[in-house]
From Swiss-Prot:
Record-stated family: Belongs to the histone deacetylase family. HD type 1 subfamily.
Cofactor(s) in the UniProt record: a divalent metal cation
GO molecular function: histone deacetylase activity; histone deacetylase activity, hydrolytic mechanism; histone decrotonylase activity; metal ion binding
Segments of this protein annotated with the region Histone deacetylase: 5-316
EC numbers on record: 3.5.1.98, 3.5.1.-
Residues the record lists as binding a divalent metal cation: D170, H172, D259
Coiled-coil portions: none
Record Gene3D superfamilies: Histone deacetylase domain (3.40.800.20)
Known function: Histone deacetylase that catalyzes the deacetylation of lysine residues on the N-terminal part of the core histones (H2A, H2B, H3 and H4). Histone deacetylation gives a tag for epigenetic repression and plays an important role in transcriptional regulation, cell cycle progression and developmental events. Histone deacetylases act via the formation of large multiprotein complexes. Also involved in the deacetylation of non-histone proteins.
Annotated SUPFAM superfamilies: Arginase/deacetylase
Subcellular locations according to the entry: Nucleus; Chromosome; Cytoplasm
Organism field: Xenopus tropicalis (Western clawed frog)
Record's protein name: Histone deacetylase 8
Length: 369
């Protein structure tokens, strides 16, 4: 593939507006992210592609018809106390809001559009920052996720690429994606996440390794609060080096949730965009077709800072430290700079424990045939 192929950036005004209005957990986040990327002049370094909207049939590649039909129904009629609603995981952390089905179809369609660009050889890197909703199950919404666009993207890529690697750097375990592929050896899932009693979703211990034919094809890296860039990168590189050699992927899907960044209301990890960027750079040097998704990130200016920095890294641009004037400029006070400073929180990741986890993972990967 020609190196001159520009990265693809999935975007349309309608898509951003839908994400802004329906994502009640992160209102206007999609606009903030896009505006900062645009303000730094990064759009001209990419090919902007308008996303399609996923059909019910396309979403049913993973989700059950009954779940999708119920989501469609409550999206139009509102929640009429239907007992099925709770069974489908709707309510609580996945509130029913008007237009939720259209939003799910838009995010799913955007990730499918990105995957199709990669499959057609039109680019080597395709980005859908409003995507990455990794908790949704086949017939159940979960953890703010109504549709698992990451799974849909992987399934689409599998139509062309025999082995697809999924790497999840969100603060939370990528349980929905792991579950979807836990029985196959064609998709390896790697998740680095906080693992602590009572912390959602409560899965993803190092001993969770997949089932049946997929045994040893689920890789979990359970981490504790306070981890910073250097240690995170050492762990990430150590795991991905082994994974790449063992699995030999043909395409990669990366979920880069920004709830690991210092200042996030989750108050857990203590990362900066540079730390995540180093991990991203490591994956990109494989020169494989790579689909990039967002995910969590509840400190909205820091999420925009993070994904803008990562976008610049992808296109090979160094950004000025000063936030450029744009629609959301006032949100970046009091210092109005791109950098995020780690807090003074202690790192709870004991070096010996981390080494034990890495040894465990290496042992599991040796079992991969």
């Amino acid at each position: 593939m020609e190196e001159s192929l520009l990265p693809v950036y999935i975007h349309s005004a309608e898509y951003v507006e839908l994400c802004d209005n329906v994502q009640s957990k992160v209102p206007r986040r999609a606009s903030m992210v896009h505006s900062l990327i645009e303000a730094y002049g990064l759009l001209k370094e990419m090919r902007v592609v308008k996303p399609k909207v996923a059909s019910m049939e396309e979403m049913a590649a993973f989700h059950t018809d009954s779940y999708l039909q119920h989501l469609h129904k409550v999206s139009e009629e509102g929640d009429n106390d239907d007992p099925e609603t709770l069974e489908y995981g709707l309510g609580y952390d996945c509130p029913i809001t008007e237009g939720i089905y259209d939003y799910a179809a838009a995010v799913g369609g955007a990730t499918l559009t990105a995957a199709e660009q990669l499959m057609a050889g039109k680019t080597r890197i395709a980005i859908n920052w409003p995507g990455g909703w990794h908790h949704a199950k086949k017939d159940e919404a979960s953890g703010f996720c109504y549709l698992n666009d990451a799974v849909l993207g992987i399934l689409k890529l599998r139509e062309k690429f025999d082995r697809v690697l999924y790497v999840d750097m969100d603060l939370h375990h990528g349980d929905g994606v792991e579950d979807a592929f836990s029985f196959t050896s064609k998709v390896m899932t790697v998740s680095l996440h906080k693992f602590s009693p009572g912390f959602f979703p409560g899965t993803g211990d190092v001993s969770d390794i997949g089932l049946g034919k997929g045994r040893y094809y689920s890789v979990n890296v359970p981490l504790q609060d306070g981890i910073q860039d250097e240690k995170y990168y050492q762990i990430c590189e150590g795991v991905l080096k082994e994974v790449f050699t063992t699995f030999n992927p043909e395409a990669v899907v990366l979920q880069l949730g920004a709830d690991t960044i210092a200042g996030d209301p989750m108050c857990s990890f203590n990362m900066t965009p540079q730390g995540i960027g180093k991990c991203l750079k490591y994956v990109l040097q494989w020169q494989l077709p790579t689909l990039i998704l967002g995910g969590g990130g509840y400190h909205l200016p820091n999420t925009a800072r993070c994904w803008t920095y990562l976008t610049a890294l992808i296109v090979g641009r160094t950004l000025s430290s000063e936030i450029p004037d744009h629609e959301f400029f006032t949100e970046y006070g009091p210092d109005y700079v791109l950098e995020v400073t780690p807090s003074c929180r202690p790192d709870r990741n004991d070096s010996q424990k981390v080494q034990e986890i890495l040894q465990s993972i290496k042992g599991h990967l040796k079992q991969v045939v």
